[in-house]
């Protein structure tokens, strides 16, 4: 296969278009940049559509090994010039390899409490970085996955992908409406712990967590509405001792998830 030298090459244009959410949604594909992330995609047997690489930008054996492994697995690999590759890359000083990966489509109907015993549900998150960081924490504590409720954020936004540090390839992400999720979770027997400044119990005071369970966190700005809080079996609070009135969403999720892990172990 000859080296791609033109910025207007159809394959390059299609890949570049994936910077836009509209194109990611229409195609079901997203871009993955960074050697570690691409290595995780390969390790997780993610559905990699293709790889673009620029030999002039590659300066590590690991990068060359990734390309060799991808080729051995039958993944189409396009060699490009450095200039063409840089038109694809978002990061400064790119490492010379970008993957086009197919999004993993998972719905609530695909999940059962047996194989999804404890997860996180986020109501209307706004920041893709928070979504990626929470997914990374889900991975770290060995939880089951992430549900995005009434969400406008794209979990395949480059910021979310980077913040997940590869966890996006290992754990399911489901998008649903709040009402759809609540109507599904209750019959499945999930115990729902909601985080709220009005919670009746400090998170540290819970001696045991019921399973299967969800940790439900409200939006960065509004928290849980009264209607959303009413769905919870228990509202828990994180103490605020100083002037801050709340924690960053990803930080709050991390605090609660590690508390759950400690009790479950």
Each language-model region and where it sits:
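N-terminal positively charged helical leader segments and presequences
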Residues: 1-92, 191
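Glycine/charged-rich beta-loop-alpha catalytic/anionic-binding loops adjacent to active sites
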Residues: 21, 112-120, 231-240
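Amphipathic alpha-helical repeat scaffolds
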Residues: 34, 127-134, 247-252
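RNA substrate-binding interface of SAM-dependent RNA methyltransferases
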Residues: 43, 69-72, 81-83, 105-106, ...
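Short, acidic/turn-prone active-site loops that include or flank metal/cofactor-
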Residues: 56-58, 83, 151-153, 220-222, ...
């Amino acid at each position: 296969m000859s080296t791609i030298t033109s910025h207007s090459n159809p394959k390059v244009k299609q890949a570049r278009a994936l910077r836009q959410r509209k194109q990611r949604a229409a195609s079901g594909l997203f871009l993955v940049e960074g050697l570690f992330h691409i290595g995780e995609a390969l390790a997780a047997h993610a559905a990699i559509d293709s790889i673009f690489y620029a030999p002039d930008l590659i300066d590590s054996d690991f990068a060359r090994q990734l390309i060799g492994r991808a080729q051995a697995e039958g993944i189409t690999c396009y060699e490009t010039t450095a200039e063409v590759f840089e038109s694809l890359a978002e990061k400064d000083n790119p490492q010379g390899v970008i993957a086009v990966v197919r999004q993993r489509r998972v719905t609530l109907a695909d999940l059962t409490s047996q194989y999804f015993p404890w997860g996180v549900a986020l109501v209307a998150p706004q920041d893709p970085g928070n979504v990626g960081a929470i997914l990374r924490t889900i991975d770290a504590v060995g939880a089951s996955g992430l549900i995005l409720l009434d969400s406008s954020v794209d979990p395949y936004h480059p910021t979310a992908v980077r913040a997940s540090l590869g966890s996006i390839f290992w754990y399911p992400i489901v998008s649903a409406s709040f009402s759809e999720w609540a109507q599904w979770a209750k019959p499945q027997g999930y115990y729902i712990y909601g985080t709220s400044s009005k919670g009746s119990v400090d998170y540290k005071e819970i001696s045991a967590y019921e399973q299967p369970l969800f940790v439900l966190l409200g939006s960065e700005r509004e928290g849980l509405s009264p209607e959303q809080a009413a769905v919870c079996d228990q509202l828990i609070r994180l103490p605020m001792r100083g002037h801050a009135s709340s924690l960053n969403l990803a930080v709050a999720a991390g605090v609660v998830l590690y508390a759950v892990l400690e009790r479950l172990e």
